Amino acid sequence: MQGTFKRFYHPTLTRMSFLDKFLKPMMATASPKEYQIKQLVKPIGLTQAPRKSTKYSQGNSLRDMFDSEKTNHRVKELAVEFSKSGLYDVQVFQKTKGKLFIAPVSYWKEDKALFFPHLIGTAMDGTKQQNIEDMLRGKTSIVRLFSTASGDKLSSSYFQGIVDDNKKTDYLTEADARLSLNDSNVQIIEVNLVENAVKSALVKTLARWANRVPSWRQPFYFECSRGQWPFSVREELFCNNVFSGYVFLVDQQLKIRWAACGEATPSEKEALWKFAKRL
């Protein structure tokens, strides 16, 4: 009888113990903590330069499941991800209005700066898929990143009402102003991180139909799958909240030299464009 009990119930107990190892630490940190808006001081990004062969992994391989150090590290990652899921983004956005962090007062030095991640996207003008880093390499780039209508609106504020030669400029509506950036070797790259291919096609079709994105912006306006960047990668860029919008100043070597999010303040707009033309 005792042998029968072990035969039928021991595997179940083992599985429960295995799951318990994962669930306990996750549940302990699952309740959202009071969000604090802090100023960026340390560089953000990845330590490895992006390559076309780069693929960011999410989770552990079967072999890693038997490595206690890697397993414990993954459990901690999952705990953070779990604590920031569901209504967390909504609650934080409502509280901060998308201002998840305050931009640094100066740009990060080249030897300290970290890299913008590898990303594949399709330009709105219908060209084939390409690596975003190929577009960034060799130019100073201002990358506008968003996933929702609110993020689109917030991130647009960094390009509107820019004072240049004593007049206000809008780099998203004025083609001549956009073209003039070439004189400073500066370009604007727009990235719409979408959840899936169906949504991507819908976004592209509606944007064209509404003539929201003029033809001169379309070669630099990309739809990219958000799934290419796992939670951990987005966390390194401080861009996990889908409701906000983000701006990254990326140098010619693909390093992030400055970043901002939410609606632009006058000082942030001034800093962004001053830094962009200085790099």
Curated annotation (Swiss-Prot):
GO cellular component, one term: cytoplasm
Keywords: Membrane, Mitochondrion, Mitochondrion inner membrane
Keyword Chaperone: no
GO molecular function: unfolded protein binding
Compartment(s) of residence: Mitochondrion inner membrane
One of the GO BP terms on file: mitochondrial proton-transporting ATP synthase complex assembly
Family recorded in the similarity comment: Belongs to the ATP10 family.
Additional detail: Mutations in ATP10 induce a loss of rutamycin sensitivity of mitochondrial ATPase.
The protein's role, per its UniProt record: Essential for the assembly of the mitochondrial F1-F0 complex.
Protein name: Mitochondrial ATPase complex subunit ATP10
Organism of provenance: Saccharomyces cerevisiae (strain ATCC 204508 / S288c)
